């Protein structure tokens, strides 16, 4: 059973994303209703922290687990940022650029894999994932703690976008170096 726990944590992120989106669409402007999706998002963010660590600690890493972890992050961030855009907490252009980057790099990694090329995650890529989860938290917390300035969430979202494109550039340049 222990060998499935990391995969189940990634699956939790995948299945929590549409639930959070639904709750945001239900009434994402109601501060009281934001508590439930905020708690679910917080738990989901921690699953991202633990799934890989547990897989390595218990020596149950697998290709399926690595795939699920990567896809879970992309599904989670895509769903949540679409919801944030719908409730007008994040600009459309930020969501479009984040999602575009995710599709481009996922496609590139698939292409590289088909060619037998491995592009390991960079420090910027790992920081990007952390910043995206922090951004989700801060956007939601701004609804709960009105003493916080909205600019804190906006700055973290912007940093997540910047790190997304820096890590995207690293993936593309890593691929190009290996194909020349």
Ranges and model annotations:
Residues 1-180:
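Alpha-helical transmembrane bundles and membrane-interface segments of multipass inner-membrane proteins
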């Amino acid at each position: 059973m222990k060998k499935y726990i990391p995969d189940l944590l990634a699956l939790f992120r995948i299945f929590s994303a549409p639930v959070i989106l639904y709750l945001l669409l239900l009434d994402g402007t109601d501060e009281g209703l934001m508590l439930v999706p905020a708690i679910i998002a917080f738990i989901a963010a921690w699953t991202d922290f633990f799934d890989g660590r547990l897989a390595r600690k218990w020596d149950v890493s697998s290709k399926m687990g690595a795939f699920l972890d990567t896809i879970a992050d992309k599904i989670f961030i895509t769903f949540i940022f679409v919801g944030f855009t719908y409730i007008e907490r994040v600009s459309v252009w930020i969501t479009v650029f984040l999602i575009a980057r995710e599709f481009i790099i996922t496609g590139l990694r698939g292409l590289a894999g088909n060619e037998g090329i491995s592009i390991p995650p960079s420090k910027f890529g790992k920081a990007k994932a952390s910043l995206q989860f922090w951004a989700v938290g801060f956007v939601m917390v701004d609804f709960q703690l009105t003493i916080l300035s909205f600019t804190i969430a906006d700055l973290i979202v912007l940093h997540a976008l910047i790190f997304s494109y820096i890590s995207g550039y690293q993936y593309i340049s890593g691929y190009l170096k290996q194909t020349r």
